[in-house]
A protein has these predicted regions:
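Conserved donor sugar-nucleotide recognition element shared by glycan-biosynthetic enzymes
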Residues: 3
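Structural core segment of the AMP-binding/adenylate-forming
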Residues: 75-129
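Generic signature of intrinsically disordered, low-complexity, basic-rich segments
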Residues: 6-7, 97
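Conserved AMP-binding/adenylate-forming core of the ANL superfamily
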Residues: 8, 16-63, 67, 71, ...
Length: 129
């Protein structure tokens, strides 16, 4: 059992409860998050071609989307590789190379630094936002 199963159960049992808040504002309820996670997991499998057990790197700032992509990776049966967004691109490249990640998800503001790493990391096939 993985963490995405707990989110799916919470989405069904306490779906209307807030699960992500940003300041005073509710960003997502349990049911909304569970639905988004399932959709993102499907896109990860279909568009990125990742199969269960493969690694997906996440170079993202602290935002609700990080939680969505992290849970989507677990939902898809992937091994999530969260990488500190404050690291230097050389350090990120080192982690990407050593983790065996084929794909990386980055927040849009980090694409300029992370996107070009696809040319420097042999096993990395793509970086998406």
């Amino acid at each position: 059992m993985n963490m995405a199963v707990f989110l799916d159960r919470a989405g069904r049992s306490v779906g209307g409860r807030p699960v992500i808040t940003v300041g005073e504002k509710t960003h997502s309820t349990c049911a909304e998050l569970a639905g988004r996670v399932a959709r993102i997991a499907g896109r990860i499998r279909d568009r990125l071609g990742l199969a269960p057990g493969e690694r997906l790197a996440l170079v993202m700032k602290n935002c609700p989307e990080f939680i969505e992509v992290l849970y989507a990776a677990w939902h898809a049966g992937l091994c999530a590789v969260p990488i500190n967004a404050k690291l230097h691109p050389r350090e990120i490249a080192f982690i990407l190379d050593n983790s065996g990640s084929r794909c990386c998800v980055a927040t849009p503001d980090l694409m300029e630094a992370v996107g070009p790493l696809v040319d420097d990391v042999p096993g990395l096939e793509r970086v998406v936002s």
